[in-house]
């Protein structure tokens, strides 16, 4: 297959280098990634200026842009290639539970799905970042399986891999997203009290059996099918009822 690879940590990050090298053993890989770290960029697109792809080497490009920009331009712009699959990562750090709303890595995969391609995002679920090779093996195995399967249109697979050697992986689990508590308070900059840093993620709130949190804690690879339809269907009638009351009073 011909695979487009991107991320949100930047084209020089260890994770994307490991991902590209791992996939290149069996597939043709084209890397189009941000020129620098764009973590937590979510699905933002750059609309206020033009973007310039820069070729770094054969089949490796960087852009001063978000992950979604990179995937969008690669599929709708400068690449004259027929891409079969989009894979984003390997992210440095987990994308579990509510993280997926903010993640540029997940957003890059979602952009690929918006543009009609099967897409996967993969993250190494630790800030130690010691076992990217494990994640590389995992994604290669999954792609070999997916090539014989069918993902319904609009589905993105969000994959999180424990930061352990491959022989310590207990297996694969299909999971749902867990939930976090509210984020921690913003932090005042040590050198300038007029500046603030965004606070850390909230602690795990829903991490029971069946969640992505639970799988990772127990050394399983977590695979969560995602969709982009954010409609809360069971609230439609409730909202309609009080809207009707507003209209009639």
Curated annotation (Swiss-Prot):
The reaction(s) this protein catalyses: a ribonucleoside 5'-phosphate + H2O = a ribonucleoside + phosphate
GO molecular function, one term: metal ion binding
Name of this chain's protein: 5'-nucleotidase SurE
GO annotations of cellular component type: cytoplasm
HAMAP family reported for this sequence: SurE (MF_00060)
Co-factor remark: Binds 1 divalent metal cation per subunit.
Tagged with keyword Nucleus: no
Entry keywords, A to Z: Cytoplasm, Hydrolase, Metal-binding, Nucleotide-binding
Subcellular location: Cytoplasm
Function: Nucleotidase that shows phosphatase activity on nucleoside 5'-monophosphates.
Natural source organism: Vesicomyosocius okutanii subsp. Calyptogena okutanii (strain HA)
Taxonomic lineage of the native organism: Bacteria, Pseudomonadati, Pseudomonadota, Gammaproteobacteria, Candidatus Pseudothioglobaceae
Top EC group: hydrolase
Amino acids binding a divalent metal cation: 8-9, 39, 91
Main subcellular location of this protein, as a coarse class: cytoplasm
Cofactor(s) in the UniProt record: a divalent metal cation
Pfam families for the chain: SurE (PF01975)
UniProt keyword Protein transport present: no
């Amino acid at each position: 297959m011909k695979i487009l690879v991107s991320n949100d940590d930047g084209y020089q990050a260890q994770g994307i280098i490991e991902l590209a090298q791992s996939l290149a053993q069996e597939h043709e890989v084209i890397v189009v990634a941000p020129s620098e770290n764009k973590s937590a960029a979510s699905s933002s697109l750059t609309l206020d200026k033009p973007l310039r792809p820069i070729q770094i080497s054969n089949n490796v490009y960087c852009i001063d842009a978000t992950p979604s920009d990179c995937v969008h331009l690669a599929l709708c712009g400068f690449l004259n290639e027929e891409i079969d699959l989009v894979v984003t990562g390997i992210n440095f750090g987990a994308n579990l539970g509510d993280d997926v709303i903010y993640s540029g890595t997940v957003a890059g995969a979602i952009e690929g799905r918006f543009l009609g391609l099967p897409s996967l995002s993969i993250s190494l679920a630790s800030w130690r970042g010691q076992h990217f090779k494990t994640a590389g093996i995992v994604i290669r195995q999954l792609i070999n399986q997916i090539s014989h399967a069918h993902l319904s249109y609009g589905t993105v697979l969000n994959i999180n891999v424990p930061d352990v050697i491959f022989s310590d992986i207990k297996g694969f689990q299909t999971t749902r997203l867990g939930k976090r508590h509210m984020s921690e308070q913003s932090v005042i900059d040590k050198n300038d009290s007029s500046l603030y840093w965004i606070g850390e993620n909230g602690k795990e709130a829903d991490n029971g059996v069946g969640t992505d949190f639970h799988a990772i804690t127990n050394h399983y690879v977590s695979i969560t099918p995602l969709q982009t339809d954010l409609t809360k269907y069971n609230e439609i009638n409730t909202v309609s009822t009080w809207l009707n009351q507003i209209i009639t009073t």
